[in-house]
Amino acid sequence: MNNFLKLNNLSKKYEKNKSLKVLNNINFKFEAGKVYSIIGPSGSGKSTLLNILSLIDRPSNGNLIINKNKIDFNDVKLNDKIRSDYFGIIYQEKNLLSDFTAIENISFAGIANGKSLKESMHISEKILKKLGLKNRSKHFPAELSGGESQRIAIGRALINSPNIIIADEPSGNLDHKNAKEFFKLLLNLKSEKRIIIYATHNRFFANLADCRLQLINGKLKSINARK
């Protein structure tokens, strides 16, 4: 069965201003083997939506379904496990551990999810080779370029073989050349039947996706699927 992620009538508002909906009645289904971009101006709800999709935040109304399983946002412990098992998350800020080498940064994410050191290092070596960084495995973050560091962030997201990869403005700190290389790697992951979702303010990179979702003031205003 192919993986899917479905939003039903999903809304979000914060306690400080309950009359303002950061997300307003979002309905959509994300399917495996496809890449989705979320575009919209600052404050449109992109990051809030990604945080709910990855179970970091919770909606005020509506629900989230992963592979026919409705998420109970009150069960924090279970959701932490679901996030670890199903999701790989890439942030704009790479947040690499400065005292860890490239391979250690990747393997640490595997160990944190219950893998042995030996297994994590073995998988990390394969990932570094796949990302074209085999010869940078012993380098520390300060010795890596911005593009290399962001590829390590991809590797860290991949080590637990996630079904869903979510990235929030992942190329925001990269120049155009490195950003293009980053998105080439990211988009290639869909061949492994994953769901890839990323938010960006850059229309060029948004248009690389199979489907582009536009958020305006918390509402899903348009859906443009590549034919």
Language model: regions and residue ranges:
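Helix-to-loop junction immediately C-terminal to a conserved catalytic motif
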Residues: 54
